[in-house]
Amino acid sequence: MSMTFRRISFLAAPLALSLLCLGLTGCGLTVRQQAAISKFSATTAALAGQVEDNLVQTRNDVVALRTGMLALDAGTVDLENTSADLDAGLNVDELETRLKAAGALKRFGMMLETLATDTQSGELQAASDQFVASLRQVQGVNLSEAKAEAIGQVISKVGGLWINARRKKALQRVIVETRQPLQTLANLVAHDFNVTNEQWLAVLTATQDEINDSLQSQMEFVAEGKHTNPEDDKSPKWKESEVTLRQDRYQALKLEAAARVKRAELISERMLRSVAGFRGAHEDLFVIIQSNKVTLDKIDGYYTEIDSLIRLSKILAAKERK
């Protein structure tokens, strides 16, 4: 064999391999792996949407019940001029903090989807930057400069002739690098939606307790012939019509509180299962990218949980409109 022939063969080998990697999925992501990533990404975006919607719903529930408590006397409340702190514990700043966690989850799903399917380096880098920026805004998530830079560098290197193989490597690195902060995000969401914790949902249940206990005690003084101010013998006395109206309003408020808390409890149960599904699917994703033989059971289960959560939310919303 001549030197020239050996030289040509040596140069042709990597070229042939490069063409093979570009033309086939074996060196990069298989169709099955891309489908798994797409399903995980879309499901995670849906989870984030449900987190956002139900955080807002809980705040609205509390404001509505507290407004009802104020309305027991007057029948209506001027929300523009009231001095009552109707959203205490669930104010806009608190809500915004929690919505950032949901936003980071959504950005993560978008980044994975872009990384798995988009060949434009600019789009890849933009998706990475948005995710990292979103993640670093979440209180309780410690993303070091080194880890943030590592994620960015992995994404920025995706491109060129070996795009498929590099994309696969990048996905593996990104999943490893984001494991801890993503699990922390999941913990934050689960903590807020756990009715036994003194967090977001606890404000709603505490409001119901206030209606059932302290307000109930006050209602005992609302009776025909009793003074409207128990501490002032000169205050007017309750009339039968006034007592009936106030009692009706109170009973309606108790029923409303029970319905809103029950809704929150049902959502809480499904939400916690969905977050657990996210944890398991996120862990499995790294293994799936490494091997095409691994089953997609956890990702499929994660999708099923989110689908169930969405359907429950729609059913409960339809009941409220009736």
For every predicted segment, state its role.
Residues 2-15:
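Bacterial N-terminal signal peptides that target proteins for export
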Residues 270-322:
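Hydrophilic extracytoplasmic domains
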